[in-house]
Amino acid sequence: MYYAIASGKIRSGFAVKHVIQDIETLNRRALKHELDVTAVSVHAYAYLKDYVILKSGGSFGLSYGPIVITRKNNKIPADKLSQCTIAIPGKLTSANLLLKLAIGNFRGIEMSFEAIPAAVAAGKVDAGLVIHEEQITYDKTKFAKALDLGKWWSANIGGLPVPLGINVASARTMSKKQIEEFSRVFTRSVKYGLENVDVAVNYAMQYGRGQTKATITKFVKMYVNKLTIDMGRDGRKAIDKLFRLAKERKIMDSDIVVTVV
């Protein structure tokens, strides 16, 4: 999504320093307001101060999303997962919130998303909440899918995409005009990436965590779609619905005001 900006394919008018970190680290840094513009989980936005959501760059699942895996020789029914110890990729991830909505309270153990399959395989946890490329690369000879949160969302919500990731800009360090201009530039960058997927994926390979180009391309095509250019009404409604459900289930205490630029 940032390829066109980072490679100078479009003029941004901004001095951009690219920071590459895992999503939960970015969530935590946003809580401390350390970044002017950053990707964060939709869930994390509920706890941020003085950030607004950019209309572009969002990650929305279209009837698919994070999954829960177990060892194949220790399959656990979805309705028993609340009794399990589950590895999670961060408390502030949208995947964690979706899982709480789906199964209620459970014992979660935070770890790097990359370490989760190995922890499940070693029996350190009963199950693992899998995000990113691991959703499509987990070893199906070793693991069984216990719950697909994308399908759960579609079955229970229906008609709205699964809200997972967004980009936010700081209203504390950037003026309203700067945020609006960056939003326009970012939209152009996302469009360029979608129109030039092959070269954009080649650029992304350097951050691909050892995944093949085919895997990264498949993952990109799953989560970089028309809603990534502009989340529009459906994207906003999906985010609002996620927060309303969280409040109804008493996972969150207050209403969350969603501001999109």
Protein language model regions, located:
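Pocket-lining segment of extracytoplasmic ligand-binding domains
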Residues: 113-205
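Secondary-structure end/capping motifs
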Residues: 175-245
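Hydrophobic/proline-rich hinge and linker segments of small-molecule sensing/allosteric domains
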Residues: 55-76, 155-171
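Beta->alpha turn/N-cap motifs
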Residues: 22-24, 33-46, 112-113, 130-136
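Short beta-strand-centered segments that line the small-molecule binding cleft or hinge
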Residues: 26-38, 49-59, 139
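Short, polar/charged alpha-helical segment
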Residues: 1-21
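Bilobed "Venus flytrap"/periplasmic-binding protein-like clamshell domains
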Residues: 1-7, 66-126, 132-133, 237-241
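Conserved C-terminal helix/tail region of periplasmic/extracytoplasmic solute-binding proteins
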Residues: 245-261
